[in-house]
Amino acid sequence: MLPTPYVKCDYDKVYEPAEDSFLILDCLEKEHDFLKQKFGNRLAIVCEIGSGSGIVTTFLMQNKIIPQENSIHLAVDINPWALEATLDTAKLNSCKSSFLEVIQADLNSSIRNNQVDVLIFNPPYVPAECVPDVPGSREEADQWLDLALLGGKDGMAITDKLLRQLEQILSPDGVAYILFCARNKPKEVIKRFVDTYKWNVKLIETRKAGWEVLSVYSFTR
């Protein structure tokens, strides 16, 4: 089992690593050989959208899930506190060999089309009446945290938006790993996506976390 990064953050401002975070880590470890074979001989661009505490991006760098030393890691989050936390977590775990850039942005709005080789997305998946507005002030900590949790109708407003853009985000041989909860109705979502885009979608792992059932799927052309 690969080591889990040490994380020390202000969890009033940044999403605390939980069962969903650890499921993604386990899935990336499970996919290690696949990713090594796919990207082991070339530089890869790896992007985590919604980096939060930075535990996933740091895990990728710390354990060389993408083996090339000079691979580029992008950590995107709309929450400025999350970007600081991601840098702190990488530094705390002595991740010095990989290039890491943090970007404050909404999803892929600051990323060039068809450049991302590996995308990881742990979205705000909790069903809610609506997606919260972006806070007007950096100091509104509770509201920043809500953005990491509340996903609108069926918890899918943000994930649906990303799925519609996936064709523009990934490189031709890229792969995306996206987390869903049972209330997102993932089987229905996957069927619609496959029917529309004719991509390959594979269930990597499902796990019961308290009363919630979480799953991670991979998406490739």
Curated annotation (Swiss-Prot):
Residues annotated for S-adenosyl-L-methionine binding in this entry: G50, S51, G52, S53, G54, D77, N122
GO CC annotation: cytoplasm; eRF1 methyltransferase complex; large ribosomal subunit; nucleus; ribosome
GO biological process: methylation; positive regulation of termination of DNA-templated transcription; regulation of translation; ribosomal large subunit biogenesis
Compartments where located: Cytoplasm; Nucleus
Enzyme class, spelled out: transferase
Gene Ontology molecular-function annotations: nucleic acid binding; protein methyltransferase activity; protein-(glutamine-N5) methyltransferase activity; S-adenosylmethionine-dependent methyltransferase activity
Catalytic reaction(s) noted: L-glutaminyl-[peptide chain release factor] + S-adenosyl-L-methionine = N(5)-methyl-L-glutaminyl-[peptide chain release factor] + S-adenosyl-L-homocysteine + H(+)
Annotated positions binding substrate: N122, P123, P124, Y125
Keywords: Cytoplasm, Methyltransferase, Nucleus, S-adenosyl-L-methionine, Transferase
Family: Belongs to the eukaryotic/archaeal PrmC-related family.
Function: Methylates eRF1 on 'Gln-182' using S-adenosyl L-methionine as methyl donor. eRF1 needs to be complexed to eRF3 in its GTP-bound form to be efficiently methylated.
Subunit structure, interactors included: Heterodimer of MTQ2-TRM112. MTQ2 is the catalytic subunit carrying the catalytic and the S-adenosyl L-methionine binding sites.
Protein name per its UniProtKB record: eRF1 methyltransferase catalytic subunit MTQ2
